[in-house]
């Protein structure tokens, strides 16, 4: 299961698309919860790749120094850089980070996936953490969003990621029948604290996954490297 399309969406598309993320939503809030638990109140630097309207920043602990890059920023600030990171390397000057997060990004990178993993690995400090979300395309009721140009199974995405990172945790965003994130306060509270896969059901009902990973030290060319996946659920 791998479908790659070389049609990439440019700034005009993302100016409108990012408006959908200008208010809090469940995946963002759960990402913030994961990040804050990893940070444990420590002072550190974070890069949000594909930050959109930077809503994540408002849910993070105040000791986390937020930086963001996006192809279509809605605001300008010293901690934000507008760039097309499919046309140019992912970076923020010469800065390196304790945490790099990419939500709703890798469904749109087409054939650039491995290159972007490599660039993110280089941005992390020793002991750093990369957090990436990815849609579960095996969901029983999943409809493929037309702009997606990088469609693959859970296993395919994890194998690719594991060439560059040790995957230490895989967390479902939620388990839902209709492939929509929970909206009621009760259901949000239940799924917000769900950090394990439900046996026999996760592959068909998990909406998305968060992959939490630490960088591998490159010893060979990426094309020759075939490590085992470290998965702790």
What residue spans do the PLM features occupy?
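Active-site micro-motifs of SAM-dependent methyltransferase domains
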Residues: 87, 106-108, 137-139
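Acceptor-substrate binding/catalytic loop of class I
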Residues: 140-156
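A C-terminal cap/extension of S-adenosyl-L-methionine-dependent methyltransferases
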Residues: 131, 169-233
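Conserved N-terminal segment of class I S-adenosyl-L-methionine
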Residues: 1-95, 103, 117, 219-233
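A short glycine-rich, Lys/Arg-flanked "PGG" loop and its adjoining helix->strand segment in the class I
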Residues: 114-126
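Conserved beta-strand signature within the Rossmann-like core of class I S-adenosyl-L-methionine
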Residues: 127-134
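Substrate-binding/catalytic lobe of Class I Rossmann-like enzymes that use SAM or dcSAM, i.e.
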Residues: 145, 160-176
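A short SAM/SAH-binding and catalytic strip from SAM-dependent methyltransferases
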Residues: 99-112
